[in-house]
Amino acid sequence: MSTVLRLAIQKSGRLSEESIKLIKECGIEFSSGGGTLKSVAYNFPLEVLFLRDDDIPGYVADGVADIGIVGENVAVETRKKMDTVRQLGFSKCRLSIGVPKAMEFTGKESLNGMRIATSYPNILSDYLFENNIKASIHEISGSVEIAPGIGLADAICDIVSSGSTLISNGLKETEVVFRSEAILAACPQLSAEKKAILDELMFRISAVKNAEKTKYIMLNVPDHAIQTVTALLPGVKSPTVMPLAEKGWSSLHSVVKESDFWEILSKLKEAGAEGILVLPIEKIVK
C-alpha cells in the first residue's frame, strides 16, 4: 500500500474554508462537502480529516494525523508537541484584554488584582507572568464577553477580529496579548516517505503563497526609457524585454507587488510607458 500523508483541518468555519481553498489551489482534488469527515485526494497522496479545531493539535502530536492546519492560538494554548512548518497568512486574529467601557484603564498595570475570564488560560498566564501582573484567571469555555456583565469577572481575554462583539457587550479592547494566524504544523515523528510528500506539498503551497498580492504587468516602452523602467520593475530576477514590430519600442513583462502597483504606475507613465496591462498570478515557483 502506497504511503499517504494525513492532513487534519477544521471541519467548518472560516479557517476550514481557507484551508480547503489553499489545498485545492495546490492542484489537489478531494471531496469537501456534505458533512464529509474524511476524504482521500484523487490526484495526490493525501487524506484529509475534518475535525474540531481544538482537537487538531492532539491528533497531530499523537501521530493520528501527520500534519494539520490550525490557528496559532489553539496550537500554543494546547501545549501539544508539534513542529510549526510555516505560517499561512490567513485567519488572522488577536487575543486581547477587554474591560467595561466605563472602566478607567491606564495600561497593563491596571490589570493587577483583577479577575480575568478567558478560554485561553495558558496564553494569558504566560502574558501575566512576562509582564509581572498579579491577576486571577477564571477559565470558561464560551460566551466569555458576558462575564463582566454578570459579575463573574472584571475583564476578559478573548479572540478579537473586528471588535464588534466586544462593543455589543459594553466592552472595550485594551491590550493585545497574542497575535495569531493559521499555521501548518507537523508531527515530529514523520517517516522519510511522509516527509517527502510534505516537501512536495510545501513546494506547492510556497508557489501559491508567493503569488498572493502579486501582479503580472506588461507594458510598451520607448527603447530610450528601458533602463529607467527596468529600475522600477525588478521582477523575479529582472524584467523580460522584447522588441516590438514598431522600431524604437519594446515590450516589458515583469512582476510587481500589488501594494506597490499604484506608486509604480505613476512613475511608469512619467517614463513614457504605454499600453499597461495588469494580470493576476496563480503560482510563482522560485
From Swiss-Prot:
Question: Which NCBIfam families does this UniProt record tie to the protein?
Answer: hisG, HisG_C-term
Regulation of protein activity: Feedback inhibited by histidine.
Which PROSITE patterns does this one have? ATP_P_PHORIBOSYLTR (PS01316)
Role, per record:
Catalyzes the condensation of ATP and 5-phosphoribose 1-diphosphate to form N'-(5'-phosphoribosyl)-ATP (PR-ATP). Has a crucial role in the pathway because the rate of histidine biosynthesis seems to be controlled primarily by regulation of HisG enzymatic activity.
Per its record, the protein catalyses: 1-(5-phospho-beta-D-ribosyl)-ATP + diphosphate = 5-phospho-alpha-D-ribose 1-diphosphate + ATP
Compartments where found: Cytoplasm
Look up the EC number in the record and give it. Answer: 2.4.2.17
In Gene Ontology terms, what is a biological process of this protein?
L-histidine biosynthetic process
Q: Which UniProt keywords apply?
A: Amino-acid biosynthesis, ATP-binding, Cytoplasm, Glycosyltransferase, Histidine biosynthesis, Magnesium, Metal-binding, Nucleotide-binding, Transferase
- State the protein's name: ATP phosphoribosyltransferase
SS bond partners: none
**Species per Swiss-Prot/TrEMBL record:** Cytophaga hutchinsonii (strain ATCC 33406 / DSM 1761 / CIP 103989 / NBRC 15051 / NCIMB 9469 / D465)
Cofactor(s) listed: Mg(2+)
What family, per the record?
Answer: Belongs to the ATP phosphoribosyltransferase family. Long subfamily.
Give the record's pathway.
Amino-acid biosynthesis; L-histidine biosynthesis; L-histidine from 5-phospho-alpha-D-ribose 1-diphosphate: step 1/9
Q: Name one GO molecular function term.
A: magnesium ion binding
Its lineage opens with: Bacteria, Pseudomonadati, Bacteroidota, Cytophagia, Cytophagales
Q: Does the keyword Ion transport apply?
A: no
User: GO cellular component terms?
Assistant: cytoplasm
Q: Matching InterPro entries, A to Z?
A: ATP-PRT_HisG_long, ATP_PRibTrfase_cat, ATP_PRibTrfase_CS, ATP_PRibTrfase_HisG, HisG_C, N-reg_PII-like_a/b, N-reg_PII/ATP_PRibTrfase_C
Superkingdom field: Bacteria
